């Protein structure tokens, strides 16, 4: 390499977001594409309404995760409309297709319910983990991972709990493999413990949209 070679003026990206770089070394051109921060999940469960669909949040470049209520066919999209990239059925389990004629994704074998989705748009793969239990371990119950919350719509989960001990978290499927914690208005994936003054509360976990939240209503 010639140390005196002119490499041009360095470019600057001023936006904090995932970016996809495409470089053509033959003609020395490049493209920079901003990656979406969320994926949408239009389908039967929300009347194919983008505004009502759950969103999956980007956690690495091209990787998205989050909760979604599924009761029938659906798709993943990177825009709140059909004008972006739509991810449909490739015909192979766990593999997506961006072909315009790709069919809808099917309801998993576990049936209607809450699922935790993990989507990789880099290699067009995805997983759906069925949520069979929403748990609330904490100081008030000796961090019992099997204490369950209840729901009537799969997206709002409640329990009346005597929160003595100050800290608790939300866990899933009677396991610590998946948990959320942190601030009441911004729960984080495997985040820190939630904190509450001692008292008896109606605890409500809201998984309708991101960020996920919880409320405490004194009883």
PLM features: what roles do these ranges have?
Residues 1-219:
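Insoluble glucan recognition modules
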């Amino acid at each position: 390499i010639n140390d005196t070679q002119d490499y041009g003026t360095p470019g600057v990206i001023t936006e904090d977001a995932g970016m996809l770089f495409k470089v053509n070394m033959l003609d020395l051109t490049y493209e920079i594409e901003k990656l979406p921060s969320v994926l949408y999940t239009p389908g039967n469960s929300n009347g194919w309404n983008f505004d009502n669909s759950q969103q999956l949040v980007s956690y690495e470049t091209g990787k998205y995760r989050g909760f979604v209520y599924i009761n029938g066919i659906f798709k993943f999209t990177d825009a709140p409309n059909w004008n972006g990239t739509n991810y449909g059925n490739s015909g192979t389990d766990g593999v997506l297709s961006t072909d315009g004629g790709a069919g809808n994704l099917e309801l998993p074998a576990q049936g209607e319910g809450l699922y935790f989705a993990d989507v990789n748009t880099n290699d067009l793969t995805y997983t759906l983990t069925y949520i069979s239990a929403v748990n609330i371990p904490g100081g008030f119950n000796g961090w019992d991972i099997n204490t369950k919350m209840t729901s009537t719509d799969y997206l709002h989960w409640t329990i009346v709990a005597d929160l003595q001990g100050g800290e608790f978290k939300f866990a899933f499927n009677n396991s610590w493999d998946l948990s959320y914690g942190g601030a009441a208005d911004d729960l984080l994936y495997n985040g820190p413990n939630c904190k509450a003054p001692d008292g008896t509360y109606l605890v409500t976990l809201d998984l309708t949209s991101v960020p996920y939240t919880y409320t405490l209503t004194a009883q």
